[in-house]
Amino acid sequence: MSEKLDFITKNNLWTDKQRDAADKVLAEIDSLGLEMIRLSWADQYGLLRGKALSVAALKAAFSEGSEVTMAPFSFNLVSEWVFNPFTAGGGFGIDEFDELGGVPSVVMVPDPTTFKVLPWADKTGWMLADLHWKSGEPFPLCPRGIMKKAVKSLSDEGYLFKCGIELEWYLTKIVDRSLSPESLGAPGVQPDAIQVQPVAQGYSYLLEYHLDQVDDIMSKVRKGLLELNLPLRSIEDELAPSQMETTFDVMEGLEAADAALLIKSAIKQICSRHGYHATFMCKPAINGFSVASGWHMHQSLVDKDTRKNLFIPSEGEVVSPLGRAYAGGLLANGSAASSFTTPTVNGYRRRQPHSLAPDRRAWAKENKAAMVRVISATGDPASRIENRIGEPGANPYLYMASQIVSGLDGIKIKRDPGGLQGAPYGAQVPMLPTALAEALDALEHDSELFRSCFGDTFIKYWLQLRRSEWARFLDAEGAEAAEPTGAVTQWEQKEYFNLL
């Protein structure tokens, strides 16, 4: 009689590297005396969800995985059913989702290579998981699974994705956590936003004095990030009062997306423990916070075998021919990818001319008004392309996957980005979407490319999910409030400020 194989082995869900890491993780857990491990996964919004497992439960999960409800994928940000799970197919209206009726469980499969010890939580570790059906097949709504597919598509062509993370966010001091019964919200009812006050005054970019004013909390953030072995490069004072920027050294592929997820979660948790609130909401509805935050993604491709940067220009070039085609792909697909780079209603407040954020699909050399900014020099190994389109509240996996898919499309069909723009805000090129609804229409109209990687099921799901968010906003605030130059509404503040 053959020996029964465990779930992970039977379905071949771990690589040799993951199996080796699993043994080392269990030994480290034992030597450090850890008691709980947070096994987490990213939901559709890029928020971490999961369970805190005992060591015994984690050991079992290293063989059989750990079951978890897929209910969060049916909810919006205020835990209202977008998809009714008690109807046929779970309310998704997608043939492939017949098995989703009744909110079934999926299986969290731990990735031991992502293990960290949380420095701010007592005897606690942290690990990411992939989501699978009980059949062993990947769960099609899992954002990390989508990123893994995108990375593989690049690898199949002989390339590796390199990414530098540059996140802007707002740091505030908590005045009232809004925990009174009338402030808590309910399923489908937004809770009140946390009440905060700024930590600095005045608009003064890169002011060292502002950094010193927040050193007490930012030293704790710095310490936490470094103890997590995240490659922190800089902490900077951004233009608006209380606006920060954190940058990180270049990372590769899936590692970069995993890191972005942990970076945002770590900053929020550390700040909250010390009476501060960090938000990656693009533009909070707070007087004086008139500058929107961005997520600028520095990216390049390297040869899979030699690890040589393939964007390095030769004499007389702005960027290599491969890099030029990649930039052409980012530009050509910029509107269709917009709901992945800028997925919230609030994120489109940023798309205004002369705001250091792009409003059209232009590219330029060292110009921060452009969507695609080329940073390069002849023979420079750090040559790269920066896409300035994104908001910090974006899901890291979907944002990065959209870049890979768009850039690889440019390479495969040799897309020409046209001439460099000397004045991007006046360039005669297509405009970017100025509202979430417009971005979703662009994706639906030109979705074949993204369906090939994200999957037809996910694209259908995403369009319905985000359109319901837009409809809720219009119902609450009206069409006039959707103008990108308009004031940030209280609906946006309640929807995004606490969680993102």
Curated annotation (Swiss-Prot):
pH effect on activity, per entry: Optimum pH is between 8 and 10.
GO cellular component, one term: membrane
Catalytic EC class: ligase
Temperature dependence: Optimum temperature is 40 degrees Celsius.
Catalytic reaction list: aniline + L-glutamate + ATP = N(5)-phenyl-L-glutamine + ADP + phosphate
Keywords: ATP-binding, Ligase, Nucleotide-binding, Plasmid
Highest taxon in the source lineage: Bacteria
Domain GS catalytic: 143-500
Single GO molecular function: glutamine synthetase activity
EC number in record: 6.3.1.18
PROSITE patterns reported for this sequence: GS_BETA_GRASP, GS_CATALYTIC
GO biological process: glutamine biosynthetic process
The keyword Nucleotide-binding belongs to this UniProt entry's keyword annotation: yes
Domain annotation GS beta-grasp: ranges: 32-136
InterPro entries, sorted: Gln_synt_N, Gln_synt_N_sf, Gln_synth/guanido_kin_cat_dom, Gln_synth_cat_dom
Subunit structure of this chain's protein: Homohexamer.
Family indicated by similarity: Belongs to the glutamine synthetase family.
Function in brief: Involved in the initial oxidation of aniline to catechol by the release of its amino group. Catalyzes the ATP-dependent ligation of L-glutamate to aniline to yield gamma-glutamylanilide (gamma-GA). AtdA1 has a broad substrate range and is able to convert the following anilines, including chlorinated and methylated forms of aniline: aniline (100%), o-chloroaniline (92%), m-chloroaniline (69%), p-chloroaniline (92%), o-methylaniline (40%), m-methylaniline (27%) and p-methylaniline (45%).
PANTHER family per UniProt: GLUTAMINE SYNTHETASE, LENGSIN
Official protein name in the record: Gamma-glutamylanilide synthase
Native organism taxonomy: Bacteria, Pseudomonadati, Pseudomonadota, Gammaproteobacteria, Moraxellales
